[in-house]
């Protein structure tokens, strides 16, 4: 422990960070966190890296802005005769090798209207699924969740781990038949990393030398190799090579329609050029999308399904009815009131995922006006302590989810050959693996609210002289609304008034991203199995920083 303390003190001295108690008003100072993440991404000492990631997790959770509810699992239904489809541990579903017997059309539902189809701009799970089936990267995942070559046939890495050279597959073509080469990767990676593109995931390129203005991701003159130079060794480099933000897009197609204000304009209607197993043939907004087999896909001979017909809806009841009526073959959502009756159904599937369902606070919200940073954090932590997570799992989730006591999920690797939650020399406040006990603690919640200036009467009900009232933002899926109602009930038990606002998926994503909320539902499924993925998203400049830290 003494060694750990000395290490952290040394890091703080090197960073020259200011104390992270209060910026101005109720917001937490965030420079220290940003610098900590930068150090984590640049260090070559992997044991030190693990300890620094634990320190960053402590800083993140101490804000109270992230309220973990449960660790995810995935629930879907598929006809028994449908085989060959698969999902990786990060919730991306692959249908290009699906086999449906004599059927060459697959009718399915993943979500409602997608927010963005440009792979560089997408940050939603449903968008990643669409991208994985219509675009491709250097690498992909096979049915076992292992890395598999895709547009690259292999790679070589330098002895110091800083240079990756990918061999590009011969004969690759875009869906319009034009050649796809390493130069398309160079253009696309530099575009996604560029500040003017405003990609939510642009920070993922930060580990590459020259980011963001002179990215060292260079194609050979003949377009047959693609060389990436890193700032520090990266254990998850192949995960990045398989991630949608790193998929190539055709420069001519992009530049024919994109504008400075809308870099993704080229992919707002059907007919754009893609590179994967399928291409978008038609799109009736807010209703349906039809993808057809891409004859120019490099592995087209192994693609059996000719058409993917998507129903665009997050109305669980309507989706389930369509499945029951035989109008859909695969659905990614099920009404909560049907789950108990489906648990023994062979068409009902529950798959573990590496992610967390949580509630997010906007630290810049007016609901924290007049409070110090410490009081605002205590306010948020108090609300977390009021939540009966097991009740939510038992009555809404119903599929064996585990209570989440931290944002980082159980089972996540530490990047150094171990499990992050079990790292030597570190302990969690709850004595187990997180920051909250599994049971609600109303008494402690009230004490924290009192420390933030709120008053309670003798029966532990909030005083009318210091009322608390706020709006909770969610999308229209029945499960999310049901969870919101559970929270509403828990908060009302001590006199807190919470109203619920539910809006369509694409609108919800943008409202949350823009910070137009005080408290909202959220969820994150890891993009790869390393804690940095769920820590770097909260840096000041990250496009996924929904809490608005440092802004």
Where are these regions (language model features)?
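Gly/Pro-rich hinge or "lid" segments in bacterial periplasmic/extracellular proteins
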Residues: 116, 122-125, 132, 140-146, ...
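Detector for C-terminal structural segments
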Residues: 23-106, 284, 386-422, 478-488, ...
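Aromatic- and charge-enriched surface segment that lines or borders ligand/interaction sites
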Residues: 48, 153-201, 221, 227, ...
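Surface-exposed binding/hinge segments that line
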Residues: 81, 156, 186, 201-255
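A structural "hinge/loop" feature
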Residues: 77-94, 112-128, 151, 237-248, ...
């Amino acid at each position: 422990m003494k060694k750990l303390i000395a290490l952290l003190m040394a890091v703080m001295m090197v960073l020259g960070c200011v104390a992270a108690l209060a910026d101005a008003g109720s917001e937490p100072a965030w420079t220290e966190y940003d610098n900590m993440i930068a150090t984590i991404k640049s260090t070559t000492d992997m044991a030190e890296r693990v300890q620094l990631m634990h320190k960053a997790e402590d800083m993140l959770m101490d804000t109270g802005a992230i309220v973990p509810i449960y660790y995810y699992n995935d629930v879907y239904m598929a006809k028994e005769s449908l085989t060959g489809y698969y999902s990786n541990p990060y919730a991306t579903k692959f249908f290009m090798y699906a086999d449906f017997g004599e059927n060459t059309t697959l009718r399915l539902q993943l979500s409602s209207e997608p927010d963005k189809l440009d792979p560089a701009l997408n940050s939603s799970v449903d968008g990643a699924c669409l991208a994985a089936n219509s675009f491709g990267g250097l690498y992909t995942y096979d049915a076992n969740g292992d890395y598999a070559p895709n547009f690259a046939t292999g790679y070589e890495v330098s002895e110091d781990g800083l240079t990756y050279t990918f061999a590009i597959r011969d004969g690759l073509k875009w869906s319009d038949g034009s050649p796809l080469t390493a130069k398309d990767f160079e253009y696309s990676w530099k575009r996604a990393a560029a500040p003017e593109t405003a990609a939510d995931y642009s920070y993922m390129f930060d580990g590459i030398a020259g980011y963001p203005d002179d990215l060292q991701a260079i194609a050979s003159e003949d377009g047959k190799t693609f060389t990436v130079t890193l700032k520090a060794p990266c254990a998850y480099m192949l995960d990045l090579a398989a991630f949608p933000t790193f998929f190539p897009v055709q420069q001519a197609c992009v530049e024919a329609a994109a504008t400075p204000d809308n870099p993704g304009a080229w992919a707002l209607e059907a007919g754009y050029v893609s590179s994967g197993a399928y291409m978008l043939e038609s799109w009736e907004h807010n209703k349906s999308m039809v993808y057809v087999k891409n004859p120019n896909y490099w592995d087209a001979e192994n693609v059996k399904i000719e058409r993917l017909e998507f129903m665009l809806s997050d109305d669980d009841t309507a989706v389930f009815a369509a499945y029951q009526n035989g109008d859909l073959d695969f659905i990614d959502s099920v009404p909560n009131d049907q789950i108990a009756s489906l648990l023994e159904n062979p068409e009902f599937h529950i798959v573990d995922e590496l992610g967390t369902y949580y509630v997010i606070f906007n630290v810049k919200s007016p609901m924290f006006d007049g409070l110090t940073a410490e009081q605002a954090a205590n306010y948020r932590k108090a609300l977390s302590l009021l939540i009966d997570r097991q009740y939510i799992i038992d009555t809404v989730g119903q599929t064996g989810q585990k209570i989440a006591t931290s944002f980082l999920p159980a089972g996540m690797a530490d990047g150094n050959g171990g499990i992050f939650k079990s790292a030597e020399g570190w302990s969690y406040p709850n004595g187990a693996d997180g920051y909250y006990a599994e049971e609600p603690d109303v008494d402690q919640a009230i004490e924290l609210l009192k420390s933030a200036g709120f008053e309670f009467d003798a029966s532990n009900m909030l005083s009318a002289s210091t009322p608390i009232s706020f709006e909770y933002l969610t999308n229209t899926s029945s499960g999310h609304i049901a969870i919101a109602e559970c929270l509403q009930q828990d908060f009302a038990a001590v006199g807190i008034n919470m109203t619920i606002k539910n809006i369509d998926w694409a609108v919800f994503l943008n409202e949350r991203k823009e910070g137009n909320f005080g408290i909202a539902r959220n969820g994150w499924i890891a993009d790869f199995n390393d804690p940095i993925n769920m820590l770097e998203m909260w840096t000041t400049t990250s496009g996924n920083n929904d809490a608005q830290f440092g802004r």
